[in-house]
Amino acid sequence: LDDRAGCAMLLAMIREELPCDCCFSFTVQEEVGCFGGKTAAYTLRPDIAIAVETTTAGDLAGVPEEKKVCRLGNGPVVSFMDRGTIYTYDLYKRVRALADAHNIPNQTKEAVCGGNESRSLMTAAGGSEVLAISIPSRYLHSPACVADEKDIENTLELLRLLPEALAL
């Protein structure tokens, strides 16, 4: 599912009439240096960039509470920070408030871990405001990756609200 679920959600949005101009980038080589994100930043020069991906849930029996980064069934994960990026705090607050205002369950990562293309988008080509919205998943990077269908639906619902809410 990593990052096919994110691609599927973006493809659904591309088919819709959006209230403002949006660019969608399907990048490569995230796991080996975020090279696709850097190329996208130089090509598109976005004001705001949102990484849509999956993140490790770790909500399994026997895993200590401090290692449970997020939980399946609690909605999309809106991160404030990971190993490569400190996300735009105002953007983080606005997206969490937007989800709450629309009764979309959401959560934040409870540990600083992982990383994604945001680190390249934040710094390349003059940088942009960045945020990551992730689907909590178990067994990430394996053929048995598991996600909650409701989390995927709630993530897409939140993503659909962003173009109008964040339009510059």
Describe the function of each predicted region.
Residues 1-31, 155-162:
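Alpha-helical metal-binding/catalytic segments enriched in His/Glu/Asp
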Residues 4-8, 33-36, 115-118, 142:
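Short glycine/serine/threonine-rich phosphate/pyrophosphate-binding segments
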Residues 12-18, 42-44, 122-127:
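Alpha-helix C-terminal capping segments
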Residues 25, 48-50, 131-133:
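Hydrophobic/aromatic beta-strand patches that form the interior of the parallel beta-sheet core
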Residues 26-33, 54-56, 137-139:
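Acidic, glycine-rich active-site loops and adjacent beta-strand->loop/helix elements
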Residues 35-105:
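Metal-dependent peptidase/peptidase-like ectodomains
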Residues 73-156, 162-166:
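Active-site-adjacent substrate-binding region
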